[in-house]
Each structure stands twice: as structure tokens, then as C-alpha cells.
Amino acid sequence: MMNFQQLVLASHNAGKLKELQAMLGHSVQLHSIGEFSQVEPEETGLSFVENAILKARNAARISGLPALADDSGLAVDFLGGAPGIYSARYADGKGDAANNAKLLEALKDVPEAERSAQFVCVLALVRHADDPLPILCEGLWHGRILFEASGDQGFGYDPLFWVPERNCSSADLAPADKNQLSHRARAMALLRKRLGLA
């Protein structure tokens, strides 16, 4: 069991910071990398795992603290796993609304039965920048892509992601519900076990 009282999150995304802090609980204080640097590392990996490790090492190097990185995205089966690791930049960095519009366009004539997808989250935790044994935890959240946006909670692709176990979109879920069901929640549950917090 490892004891981490402070971690730096390798993200400038306030929504992600809030979500992960709620899942971690109060025994660990999560800092944003934005407290140390505004520079985003180049995500040169070809997988969620590679990018999560790269971001965690970069955050540990900049902050001097143990670092937690999340690399997550949406993998749509009909699109061969796209947008995948490019989820945040799917519409050339133009933001959530543009990403959602591009996804709907890509699936324009695709029937409901072929719109299966999963949110993927890989968490990487490093004790220091050169940690030879990062802790890796993966969470998957299976659903499908809607034909139009629904709900106003969450961020990213949440308004387009149908959650079969709740019969609504991810953006229709209250944050507390999402924090129990999501890909990030599943990965975080594994991480909490690894850290002896569960």
C-alpha cells in the first residue's frame, strides 16, 4: 500500500479535476498541473496507456509531486475505435460542440444497432518522473451514440452517450450518479484499491 497525501493531476480540465477529486475523496489532495505550468505536453503516444504515462511523467517533472494522469476518450465501434486518443481534438481543437457535431456527421446514416461505443479511461500514477513502475488502471463504460444531444450535465461527448443501465444520456445523469458509473469511476475504483483507499 502506498500513501499519497498530495497528487498533481496532469490536466488543465476543471471538470476532470472536480470529478476525480470527488472520486478520490478527502484523504488525497489533488492539485491541477495549471498551478505549476500552463504548457500542455505533446501527446505523442498511439494509445491511451502511452499518453497517460507521458502526461503523468511530465506533470511529476514539472511539479516535483507524485502525478496522476488520465487519458480518456470515446471509442466508437463503427468508426474503428475513432475518435479514440484524438477525442478532445477530433474537430481540430475547436471544442466540445464541434467534436459532437463531427461525430454526429460521421454517424449520420448509421442505424441505432451499429452505434455501439465505449468511453475509455486509463489512469497512470507515477511516484516521480522516472518511476519505472507506473500504476495503471483502466475503466470502460459501454453504451451507444445517440442521434442528437440530450442533457446539460457533464462535458465532452456526454450529451451523445446513451447509458443503457439508466436509460438516459451521460449528460442527463446527476454528477453523483455519473461518478459511480463512468469509465473514470471504474478506473478510479481500481486505483483506490491499489492505494488502499477502498
UniProtKB/Swiss-Prot annotation:
Q: What class of enzyme is it?
A: hydrolase
Protein name as annotated: dITP/XTP pyrophosphatase
Q: Which cofactor does it need?
A: Mg(2+)
Going by the entry's taxonomy, the superkingdom of the source organism is recorded as: Bacteria
Q: Which UniProt keywords apply?
A: Hydrolase, Magnesium, Metal-binding, Nucleotide metabolism, Nucleotide-binding
Q: How is the cofactor bound?
A: Binds 1 Mg(2+) ion per subunit.
Gene3D superfamilies per the UniProt record, alphabetical:
3.90.950.10
Q: Which PANTHER family match?
A: INOSINE TRIPHOSPHATE PYROPHOSPHATASE (PTHR11067:SF9), INOSINE TRIPHOSPHATE PYROPHOSPHATASE/HAM1 PROTEIN (PTHR11067)
Tell me the leader sequence span.
none
The record's section on HAMAP family has: Non_canon_purine_NTPase (MF_01405)
What this protein catalyses is: XTP + H2O = XMP + diphosphate + H(+); dITP + H2O = dIMP + diphosphate + H(+); ITP + H2O = IMP + diphosphate + H(+)
Residues binding substrate: S11, H12, N13, A14, G15, K16, S72, F155, G156, Y157, D158, K178, H183, R184
Per the Swiss-Prot or TrEMBL record, the active site comprises D71 (proton acceptor)
InterPro entries hit by this protein = dITP/XTP_pyrophosphatase, ITPase-like_fam, RdgB/HAM1
> Does the record carry Nucleus as a key word?
no
Record-stated family: Belongs to the HAM1 NTPase family.
What GO MF terms are annotated?
Answer: dITP diphosphatase activity; ITP diphosphatase activity; metal ion binding; nucleotide binding; ribonucleoside triphosphate phosphatase activity; XTP diphosphatase activity
EC number(s) of the enzyme?
3.6.1.66
Q: What residues bind Mg(2+), as annotated?
A: E42, D71
Supply one GO BP term. nucleotide metabolic process
User: Oligomeric state and partners?
Assistant: Homodimer.
